[in-house]
């Protein structure tokens, strides 16, 4: 994916495998602006030093000297490691979490499963069951809870839980309780469609303006406010429809005799959605990267150039058609 990138993959080495690649910031348009450690050598030293105290972690080097694969115990495990390194002054990039699979005794592909226990008020029960159903969860038990509401028990592929926790909090308005337990390995269940809309992607490098943001927020939900440095290919919001959309959030209003720059003061913008590290890890897709620095967390497309992204998508469609 380009020189100067390291990679780490989150997975569970013993039970409940899940994974996500991460990298150094060499391919970022804003390298070294917020961190002290930006080189892959420093990233390697830090990752291998972590093995001395973090017994659940495993680090593997790849064919590329600046890419690594890190195996952990889940999304939270990776998030804690990334946040710790971020506060220490490291810059890195992370890609979408994935799940580790294995080949069973019969030669078939197997994946990890989790047992999910949920306590939820009755009014949100249907929404939770529907959301888990699309993630290939199977209901094992349903009974009244001790303090009211319903107690639900599911068995679900670990892949189905990736990105679900924040969605669960939204579905239950923060009133639900969710806990998981590793169940074991089972047959591969096939593709799981992620209920994910497209992204609003910055088409130019610059600083966001109220005028540019006001046009963009008509197309979806923004992640950035005015006065924020952005670059081409950076994800600045969630598209209200499927598919990514390029937007110019740096666009300025053309001044005339009847208009002045002070007229931007009259533009009212909806406050942007605060995307924490955990939320970003759950949001990014296969063609996205999460750029983490001590001062900011930014999501971007793996390929920053819009024309190159379209060509790559066309090649993928042609490969699938064959």
Residue ranges of predicted features:
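Accessory interaction regions appended to the cores of large information-processing enzymes
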Residues: 1-322
């Amino acid at each position: 994916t380009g020189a100067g990138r390291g990679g780490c993959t989150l997975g569970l080495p013993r039970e409940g495998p899940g994974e996500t690649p991460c990298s150094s910031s060499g391919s970022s348009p804003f390298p070294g602006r917020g961190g002290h450690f930006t080189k892959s050598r420093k990233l390697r030293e830090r990752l291998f030093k972590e093995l001395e105290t973090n017994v659940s972690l495993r680090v593997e080097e790849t064919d590329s000297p600046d890419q690594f694969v890190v195996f952990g115990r889940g999304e939270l495990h990776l998030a804690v490691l990334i946040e710790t390194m971020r506060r220490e002054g490291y810059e890195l990039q992370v890609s979408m979490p994935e799940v580790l699979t294995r080949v069973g005794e019969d030669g078939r592909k197997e994946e990890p499963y989790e047992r999910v226990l949920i306590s939820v008020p009755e009014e949100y029960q249907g929404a939770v069951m529907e959301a888990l159903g699309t993630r290939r969860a199977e209901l094992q038990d349903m009974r009244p809870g001790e303090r009211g509401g319903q107690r639900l028990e599911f068995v679900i592929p670990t892949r189905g839980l990736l990105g679900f926790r924040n969605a669960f909090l939204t579905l239950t308005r923060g009133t639900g309780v969710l806990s998981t337990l590793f169940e074991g390995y089972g047959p591969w269940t096939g593709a799981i469609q992620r209920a994910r809309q497209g992204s609003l992607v910055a088409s130019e490098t610059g600083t966001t303006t109220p005028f540019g943001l006001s046009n963009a927020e008509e197309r979806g939900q923004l992640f950035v406010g005015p006065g924020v440095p952005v670059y081409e290919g950076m994800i600045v919001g969630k598209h209200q429809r499927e598919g990514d959309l390029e937007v110019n959030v740096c666009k300025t209003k053309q001044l005339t005799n009847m208009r002045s720059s002070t007229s931007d003061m009259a533009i009212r913008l909806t406050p942007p959605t605060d995307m924490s590290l955990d939320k970003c890890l759950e949001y990014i897709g296969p063609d996205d990267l999460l750029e983490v620095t001590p001062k900011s967390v930014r999501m971007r497309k793996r390929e920053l150039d819009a024309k190159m992204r379209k060509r790559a998508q066309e090649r993928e469609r042609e490969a699938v058609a064959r």
